[in-house]
Amino acid sequence: MIVINKEDCIRCGACQGVCPTGAISVKPEDVIYCDMCGGEPKCVEACPNDALRHEDITLEGGIKKKKITYSPEKCDKCGECVKVCPPGILKLVNDGKASRVPLEGFCVLCQQCVNVCPIEVIGIEGVKEPARVEIKIDKPIYIVDCVGCGLCVPECPVNAITLPKYGESIEIDEEKCIKCGICAQTCPWNSVYISGKKPQKSSRTIENFTLDKEECIGCNTCVEICPGGFIEPKSDLTVSLPEICPACGLCEKLCPTDAIELEVKLGPAKPVTEEGIVYNDENCKFCGRCALNCPNEAIRVVSPKGRVFPGLKKVDEKESYTICTTCGACTTVCPTGALKLVEVSKKVNGETVKRNRIQYNPSLCDKCGNCVDVCPYGILKLTDDEKLPVKGFCILCEKCIDACRFNALLIK
């Protein structure tokens, strides 16, 4: 069975892209895959028609392992296998057509995922151990093995990142950096670490990745520059682009004839903070009580049923939680000084400590909207309220903590 080192996985999705049976699903928060239930697949046990079987396969070197085989002609689509699948990766294909293979999500041990992983964090039990990335993060801003793609540069809300040249390492101005962690979440190669922690990656969708064969001159610059080796040269003096990759864009940026076009949509940043109001996603039930009690709408919650708090508007979104982390990005671009980052005294574990809060003077605000544009989490907004024309910033009142019944919020 395959084994994935989820901790060091960069969530590029290449394994998902090459898996012929849909047995891997890569998400920002997790990697879900068929692990054959540790050697005793429950789907095989549950199948009443012997459509799923556990059979021997001989790997390179004569090593014998097990794989799952599937006989579509025996399958009656009863769904018993789907019900018992522990990771929830098995699914019946219901596309309205007579599908040739109506079941997806079982591992056939083809090893394509192992071969394609650019950092070798996918292995096979007893054959090849998944690689472990050993790094010592000893600085608040830590950069290692940066490929110089520059993807993080335009995402920085305070313009603290510069890239001298594509292919060279980025530089981060420690005086400007507000430790929001967006660069680390955006980095497709796990080269940036902020505040000593590994980030949860932002979602990344490749909307367009194409090659203009008429413009391609077969120079192989893209082949040589691709950090993961995803691009392959072809005999007709063009190249073959992958369906899924980290989408760093180095190939597009360094192509001398502009023959490559790449369009990537990044998902929203995740609030990151270890001081002030801290959110524990494991305890959160997305009930929205915190958002309803926040006096300044500095929290936005989407419930499992698609209701947004505050406001109760119905939206077509998955459950999510967004909170102002008092990162201070808004204060750095405010031209009038209406928004300021100030320190207040708070009690934390019996000790009095200084913590940041956002201070706002409406009389100085000219409603320019710079703060809204720069907010890393999209929580700030302009309002029609003359008394409070900007909302969404945390004043550290702690009412959200008092409202939460599940200990998902606390002050540190």
UniProtKB/Swiss-Prot annotation:
UniProt domain 4Fe-4S ferredoxin-type: residue ranges: 2-29, 30-57, 66-95, 96-127, 138-166, 168-197, 207-236, 237-265, 275-304, 311-344, 356-385, 386-412
UniProt keyword annotation of ATP-binding present: no
Cofactor binding note of this UniProt entry: Binds 10 [4Fe-4S] clusters.
Cystine bridges: none
GO molecular function: 4 iron, 4 sulfur cluster binding; electron transfer activity; iron ion binding; oxidoreductase activity
Positions bound to [4Fe-4S] cluster: 9, 12, 15, 19, 75, 78, 81, 85, 107, 110, 113, 117, 146, 149, 152, 156, 177, 180, 183, 187, 216, 219, 222, 226, 245, 248, 251, 255, 284, 287, 290, 294, 324, 327, 330, 334, 365, 368, 371, 375
Record keywords, A-Z: 4Fe-4S, Iron, Iron-sulfur, Metal-binding, Repeat
Cofactor entry: [4Fe-4S] cluster
Cross-referenced PANTHER family: ADENYLYLSULFATE REDUCTASE, BETA SUBUNIT, FERREDOXIN III
Record protein name field: Polyferredoxin protein MvhB
Organism: Methanothermus fervidus
